[in-house]
Amino acid sequence: MVSNYNEKHIKVLKGLEPVRKRPGMYIGSTDTRGLHHLVWELFDNAVDEALNGSANKIEVVHKKDGSIIVTDNGRGIPVGKNLATNLSTVDTVYTVLHAGGKFDDQAYKVSGGLHGVGASVVNALSRKLIVTVHRDGGMYESIYQDGGKIIQPLKKVGNSTKHGTIVQFWPDPTIFKNIQFNPYMIKERLHESSFLFKGLKIVFVDENNPELSQTFIAKDGILEYLKYVNENKKSISKIIPFKGDYEKIVVDGCFQYTDNESELIISFANSVKTSEGGSHENGFKQAMLETINDYSKKYKLINNKDKGFDWSDLKEGLSVVLSVQVPEKIIAYEGQTKNKLFTQEVKVAVAKILTQQLFYFLEENQADAKQLIERFKLIKEAKEAAKKAKENTKKLKSAKSERVLYGKLTPAQQKNPLQNEIFLVEGDSAGGTAKSGRDKRFQAILPLRGKVVNVEKSRLQDLLKNEEILSIISCLGCGIGNNFNIKNLKYHKIIIMTDADTDGAHIQVLLLTFFYRYMKELIEQGKVYIALAPLYKISAKNSNKSAFAWDDYQLDELRTKYGSYEVQRYKGLGEMNSEQLWTTTMDPSKRQLIQVSIQNAAQAERKVSILMGDDASIRKNWINENVDFSIEE
C-alpha cells in the first residue's frame, strides 16, 4: 500500500487509453466472449443503418488471416471535418470515445450501438483497423494501428457510385487471450439477427471453410424465429402475435406454448439481444398475467374470490420472442454491454399493447383460451399438491437425501463456497482415484455411480426419483427450478469429469441438459466446467522422462522430441493413478477446463430439444460426429 498518496498518483488517460487499460469495462471480458463482442459492435452499427431504412444488405467476412470485415450499403459515415475535434468525422468516430451519430436523434431515431463508443472501442482493442467509406461519389479510407493510432488520416482514394461503410479489423493479441474467431458463433448470431428484420439480406462468408458461408433472409420476421426455436417441440397452442407502437416505442412479439417444462424468453432492444431481460420482459409478464387472470374471472373459469394465477403457473412450456424499438433519446441499459434494458417507458408500452391484443385473441378464440387456462389450473393444482407433499415428507426426504449422499460425497475441508469446487466424476473407480488425488482443502468429489436420467424426457416429479440427480441437487445446495437460488450455491466451480469416449460425452450431455433446464443460471454465471483429461501418456524408452498429450497434434510433437518411446492411450479416468489424475486434470495450475456458456439461447434450445429428444440415434450420431474428446486450441 502507498502511504504518501498525492498528486502524482492521479493518472489522466488520453484518447483510447482507458479502453486498453480496462477493456472489461467496455466489452465485458477479454476472453472469447469479449473477442466476439468486437464483431457484434461493428455488426450492430451496420444494423443501425438498416433500422433507419438506409441499408438492405450487410456482409460479414471471416478472412484467412484472422481478420473480420463488416460491410453495409447504408449512407456511409460522413467524411467532412468535425468542428469539435478538427479531425475528419470518420477519424473522430474511430478515435474519440463517445463520438458518433447516435447522440443526435436527427441522424438515428433508434440504434443498437454501444452508447457511442462501439466503433472507437473496436479500434482501441485492435492491432490494425481499416475503414473504407463510399459516399457522395467518392471512396475514402483511414488506417489505424496499435490500438487506434492514426497511420493514415482519412483521404480520398478513388471515385465510387456506391454508398456504405466497410470496416476490417485484426484483434490485438496483447489484449485478448485468444484471437481466433469462432465462425459457428458468428454465423448463429447473424442468423438470429436476420429474424428481426423482414427482408434484410445478411451474408456470412468464411474464407477458411467456404461450406459455412450462408445468406440469411427472413420473410416472416420473428414469427419465423419462434417457429425455428420450437421446431423440434410439440406445440400445444397457436403462435399468438402482438404488435404495435405506443409513445414512439415499437413493439413486435409472439409467443407459443409447447409440451416442454421450461420457459424461454428471447428479447431484443433496438436489435441487440438483452440476455438478462429488463423492462420489456417485465412488461410482457405483467400484462400476460393480468390479462389471463382478468379473462379467467370474467368468464368464470376461475373463482372470483381466488387470488388467481401467479407467473410460475403460466411460464411452463412458454416460448417468447420479443423485440422493441426505442427512441435513442430515452433508451437506457444497465451497464455498457446492453444485456439488460432499463427504460421504464418500454414496460408500459409492451404491457398496453399485449393486454389489448391478448384479450382480443382470447375472446375471439375461446376454445383455445379455455384449453390454455385449464392447463394453467392443472399446473397450479399440481404445484400446490407437490408443496403439501413436500411439507408432509420433508423429514423423510431429508433423511433419504442424507442416506443417498452418505458414502458418496467426499466434502472439502474448508467451508468457503467462493474457494471450493466439486468434481462430478463418472464411475466409482475414477471417483476413488479422484478422492486420493484431490486437494482436500477445497476440492469435493461426487462419484456418479448409476445412470443419470435424461431430463428432457422426464417430468420434474420423476426426475427427483433419480438418485444421481438427487445427489447433485443436495450437494450444490441451491435448489432447482422455481426454488433455485444461486446465493446458496456451495461451490464456485462445478467440474464435470468423465472418460474421453462416447459414454463419457453422453454423460456430459445429460448433465449439461439438467443444468440448462433446471439450474440455467449456473451456466449463465460461468459456474459449470468440463475437465479435459489427457488422451495419451508418452514415455521415453531410454530415460525416465514422460509427458501427457491432450490431442494427436501434441502427441506428434512429443514423438519427434522423444525419438524412442512408448505410447499409452487412456480409455478411462480409472487408468490413471491419483498422482497422474491430479497433475493432468485436477491441479488448478496445470489442468485444462472448458467453461460452459450459452452464447445463443435459440440455438441452445434447439440443440437441447434435438439431442435429448426421443430419437436416441440422433444423439449418438451427433456425439460421434462432433465430439473429438480433445482440447480446443
From Swiss-Prot:
Function of the protein: Topoisomerase IV is essential for chromosome segregation. It relaxes supercoiled DNA. Performs the decatenation events required during the replication of a circular DNA molecule.
Alphabetized UniProt keyword annotations: ATP-binding, DNA-binding, Isomerase, Magnesium, Metal-binding, Nucleotide-binding, Topoisomerase
Residues engaged in binding Mg(2+) 2: 499, 501
InterPro entries, per the entry: DNA_gyrase_B_C, HATPase_C_sf, ParE_type2, Ribosomal_Su5_D2-typ_SF, Ribsml_uS5_D2-typ_fold_subgr, Topo_IIA, Topo_IIA-like_dom_sf, Topo_IIA_B
Originating species: Mycoplasmoides gallisepticum (strain R(low / passage 15 / clone 2)) (Mycoplasma gallisepticum)
UniProt cofactor note: Binds two Mg(2+) per subunit. The magnesium ions form salt bridges with both the protein and the DNA. Can also accept other divalent metal cations, such as Mn(2+) or Ca(2+).
Ranges for domain Toprim: 420-534
Name of the protein: DNA topoisomerase 4 subunit B
Keyword ATP-binding listed: yes
Residues reported to bind Mg(2+) 1: 426, 499
Subunit and interaction comment: Heterotetramer composed of ParC and ParE.
